[in-house]
């Protein structure tokens, strides 16, 4: 099964690093999320929306929180991606792990569950190319924002 995994060390505590994926203000500031609905509990919804206009919502990622351990891990199952130019893609899994280090926190992001076919190949390649830039964007954002 194909998966995408990237890690980066961030000079911030684990709880702040994980909050970058759960707090709307952080999501808005580093990832450009325009709307979110997140229930931080097992079985809770995790939904992010980008490119909102008066007529439509551009891109939506949504799933079910399978595990949430503050300052440690966020596991989202049944992750589905909506793109107006593509078929709905899912279900997948997204795992966000934080590991305390002497100099901060290692953030590891793993996205898995990619199927086969042209749209899946397109999405896998987009995500494979995007996550390295995304984790560096998180690092830059968090290391330049106050605790």
Which ranges hold each PLM region?
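A conserved amphipathic terminal alpha-helix motif
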Residues: 113-147
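Generic short beta-strand segments
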Residues: 45-51, 77-81, 110-114
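Short beta-edge strand/loop motif at the mouth of beta-sheet-based domains
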Residues: 5-6, 25-60
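Conserved catalytic core of Hanks-type protein kinase domains
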Residues: 20-21, 68
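Hydrophobic-ligand binding "helix-grip"
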Residues: 36-37, 56-104, 112
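Solvent-exposed alpha-helix faces
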Residues: 22-23, 136
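Aromatic-glycine hotspot motif
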Residues: 2-14, 52, 66, 99-108
């Amino acid at each position: 099964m194909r998966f995408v995994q990237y890690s980066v060390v961030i000079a911030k505590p684990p709880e702040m690093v994980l909050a970058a994926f759960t707090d709307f203000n952080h999501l808005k500031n580093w990832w450009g999320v325009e709307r979110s609905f997140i229930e931080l509990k097992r079985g809770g919804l995790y939904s992010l929306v980008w490119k909102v206009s008066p007529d439509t919502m551009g891109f939506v990622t949504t799933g079910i929180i399978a595990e949430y351990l503050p300052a440690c891990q966020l596991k989202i199952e049944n992750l589905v991606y909506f793109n107006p130019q593509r078929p709905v893609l899912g279900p997948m899994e997204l795992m966000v792990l934080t590991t305390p280090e002497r100099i901060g926190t290692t953030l590891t992001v793993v996205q898995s569950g990619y199927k086969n076919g042209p749209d899946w190949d397109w999405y896998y390649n987009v995500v494979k190319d995007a996550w390295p830039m995304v984790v560096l964007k998180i690092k830059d954002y968090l290391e330049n924002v106050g605790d």
